[in-house]
């Protein structure tokens, strides 16, 4: 029996509550599908920083590297009565530090409408809204290159540089092409393909999101690299859309998307739009991945700490449970991941809404429902 070592960072606010439900479901899956789980809790977060002055250091990272994956709740201090921490301290020294030091170069965000979940898009069905966004996670404008000159004068200049190298682009595209290739088969191709594409042997679609008409250098590189790599994937139809068109179509015609690949900043924007379309942050899960051999990836619910709901047993744990499914699937337990997803799909129709305090169930009861559905 294989045992998976999971580093657990519950974090702040309602993070520990939703992570607790995710672990509950993981343990039920481990029992059913005969694999082991070994977990260790790490206290990183805003409260820990205020108490100890400690963030994440080299020794912490060395220990985290011995685990198979990291399961994260949420980190941050906000809400009434919260003690103040300067903006950027927690983000740069915990979240971004782990992302960059562990080279988690893929941000994976499934956009999936579960049964019974209300989408703001009228008439959309779970069969139509089921795609994945692959966001490059370590480059682009978020690397911090740039600066300010003549600060405080009428001629003050601020710049932020949008930089990519071919290596970063290629490895992100490679992951996206491989994911698209694996999502469908010839017998069950992507439903959005044309008859001509299916006749030509296409089974999947990868859509590159960029802005080649304005950001000609950066997205010229992305487009050129994608077209060259597409020659290696005859079953994957490569499409291109400008980012503004992507936003429009995610609302008007989500069924045309299978896998979307994009850069860091555009990915940051469209993934939150995707979360809204699928019913909100309460159901949106994601992963910061290093898919290379020996890489350690980090999985999390997308919502924040929700401090106003801390300790009230009313926060929605579905996103955290979905993140657990994503994690265990990427660790090789495919059947367990599929079973958890199926259990979520059986649970969401029983919930009144996906909003905190309005689910018709408590946080722990929702976790129980998913675990029992396994």
Question: Where in this protein do the model-derived segments appear?
Answer:
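Glycine-rich phosphate/nucleotide-binding loop
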Residues: 48, 89, 248-351
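Short acidic loop-to-helix transition motifs that present clustered carboxylates
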Residues: 116, 241-248
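Buried hydrophobic positions in well-ordered alpha/beta secondary-structure cores of metabolic enzymes
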Residues: 12-15, 68, 134, 176, ...
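Extreme N-terminal starter segment of soluble prokaryotic enzymes
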Residues: 2-6
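Glycine-rich phosphate/diphosphate-binding loop of Rossmann-like nucleotide-binding domains
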Residues: 7-24, 28-30, 153-241
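N-terminal glycine-rich phosphate/adenylate-binding segment common to multiple enzyme folds
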Residues: 49-159, 265-267
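Buried hydrophobic packing segments
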Residues: 22, 26, 226, 320-328, ...
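N-terminal beta-loop-helix "entrance" segment that forms/cooperates
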Residues: 34-58, 250
């Amino acid at each position: 029996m294989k045992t998976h070592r999971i580093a657990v960072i519950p974090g702040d606010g309602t993070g520990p509550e939703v992570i607790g439900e995710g672990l509950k479901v993981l343990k039920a899956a481990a029992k059913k599908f005969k694999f082991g789980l070994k977990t260790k809790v790490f206290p990183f977060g805003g409260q820990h920083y205020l108490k100890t002055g400690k963030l994440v250091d080299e020794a912490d990272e060395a220990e985290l590297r011995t685990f198979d994956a990291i399961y994260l709740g949420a980190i941050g201090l906000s809400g009434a009565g919260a003690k103040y921490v300067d903006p950027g301290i927690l983000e740069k020294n915990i979240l971004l530090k782990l992302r960059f030091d562990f080279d988690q170069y893929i941000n994976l965000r499934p956009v999936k409408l579960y049964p019974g979940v209300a989408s703001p898009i009228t008439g959309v069905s779970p069969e139509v809204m089921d795609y994945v966004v692959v966001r490059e996670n370590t480059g682009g404008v978020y690397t911090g290159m740039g600066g300010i000159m003549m600060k405080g004068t009428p001629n003050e200049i601020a710049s932020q540089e949008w930089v990519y190298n071919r290596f970063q682009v290629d490895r992100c595209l490679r992951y996206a092409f491989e994911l698209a290739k694996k999502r469908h088969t010839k017998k069950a191709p992507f439903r959005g393909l044309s008859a001509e594409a299916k006749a030509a042997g296409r089974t999947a679609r990868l859509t590159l999101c960029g802005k080649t008409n304005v950001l000609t250098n950066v997205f010229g590189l992305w487009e050129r690299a994608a077209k060259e790599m597409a020659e290696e994937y005859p079953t994957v139809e490569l499409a291109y859309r400008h980012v503004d068109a992507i936003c429009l179509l995610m609302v008007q015609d989500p069924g045309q998307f299978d896998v979307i690949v994009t850069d860091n900043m555009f990915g940051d924007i469209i993934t939150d739009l995707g979360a809204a379309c699928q019913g909100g942050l309460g159901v949106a899960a994601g992963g910061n991945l290093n898919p290379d051999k020996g890489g350690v990836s980090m999985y999390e619910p997308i919502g924040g700490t929700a401090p106003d709901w801390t300790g009230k047993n009313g926060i929605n744990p579905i996103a955290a449970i979905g993140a657990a499914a994503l994690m265990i699937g990427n660790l090789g337990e495919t059947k367990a991941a599929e079973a958890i997803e199926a259990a979520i799909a059986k649970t969401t129709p029983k919930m009144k809404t996906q909003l905190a305090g309005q689910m018709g169930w408590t946080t722990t009861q929702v976790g129980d429902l998913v675990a029992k559905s396994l």
